[in-house]
Structure formats: C-alpha cells, structure tokens
Amino acid sequence: KLVMLQKEYPDNELFGTYKSEVRALRAMYYYYLLDMFARVPIVESSTIEIKDVRQSKRSEVFAFVRKELEESLPDLSDAKSAAEGEYYGRMTQSVANYILAKLALNAEIYTDDDWTDAVKPDGKNIKFTVDGEEVNCWEATVKYCNRITASGYALTQGLNGFSANFAAKNEGSIENIFVIPMDPTLYKANMMYLTRSRH
C-alpha cells in the first residue's frame, strides 16, 4: 500500500517516515513471533503465493528483525509515543531501541537454530554496532537502554510505582515507551483491544 501511495503522491515528504514506522512496527510483530514461536515464515510481499512461503530459521528471523529496526531507526521521530500529540501511539526511536534492547538481551537464544544440542552461542561473540561502535550483545543491551533513559524515560518511584503502570489511567507514567491509544472518546475502536491477552 505504501508503494502505491508513493506513486500517487511522489512529492510527499513524509513517505520515508511512514515507511520506517511501518517497517519498525512489522519488526515488532516479528519480534513477538520470534520470541513465542522461533521459526516462522518471513513474508515481505503482499503478492507472494502461499506455496512459496517457507519457514525461516530462528536466526534468520532474528537477523530480519534486527535489520528492519536498525535501518528504520534514523527515520523515526525522537518524540515520545506516550505523549499526546502527533506521535501519540506511533512507532518512535525509543520504541525501536526498546525492541533492539530486548533482541540483544536474548540474542544467545534467538541465534541458536538447534536448541536440542546443548550447545548455545556465546553472547560475547554476537556483535551489534551501536553509535558507530561494535559491541557484544550484552553491551548493546546497555547502550540501547541508555538511549531510552536519555530520551526521558525512567522507572516509576515509590511504593505504588510498579503497580501504577497497570492502572486503567496510566497515561502519565514515565515508563510508558509504546502505547496503544485507548481513550473512550478519541479512540473508541481501540477500547476493544484485549489488554491482557498476551500474558
């Protein structure tokens, strides 16, 4: 659809941003598939026939998610997804950094295509390039998290801090990196989203 829109409106300066947001959003869903099912098909075209779809290795899905996020990151906004305004509920740099941090943290698992052989990759040998520096997956996790913290996110403090994140009206939390708009007035259709279906 984006390619069709680009042809129809070739001078639209927001096309690059929209394309990066869609790629990063798709990468997030592939991350969920990777985390829950490991080996899933990677489909990048809406015209591919089902007979041509093949199951990908876990390491291939890992590499795909990583590539999509790393390539999309520069074109994403540095705004907060949780803040009211133009980028509310949209994919931003902090969201991509959050997914990359989770990807790096679990890289030993996600790059292991044969989890039955008792041999697993060593995280010290799984390299990421972050801010122009090649680092192992553990160091990459810290760097991605530092980017998020530098963007103004933090852990909620106090006795009720953690539980406050799960309250019905938690829109003011400084922990909310990526939000799903659920305002009963502005976003009525999203109120049907099953908030606890994954956990």
What are these regions (language model features)?
Residues E44-I48:
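Outer-membrane beta-barrel translocator domains and adjoining extracellular loop/strand segments
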Residues F37-V43:
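Short, flexible active-site-proximal loops enriched in glycine and acidic residues
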Residues K1-F37, E49-E86:
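Conserved, well-structured interaction surfaces
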Residues V40, E70-E71, D75, R90-H199:
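An aromatic- and glycine-enriched ligand-binding surface/loop that stacks and positions planar moieties
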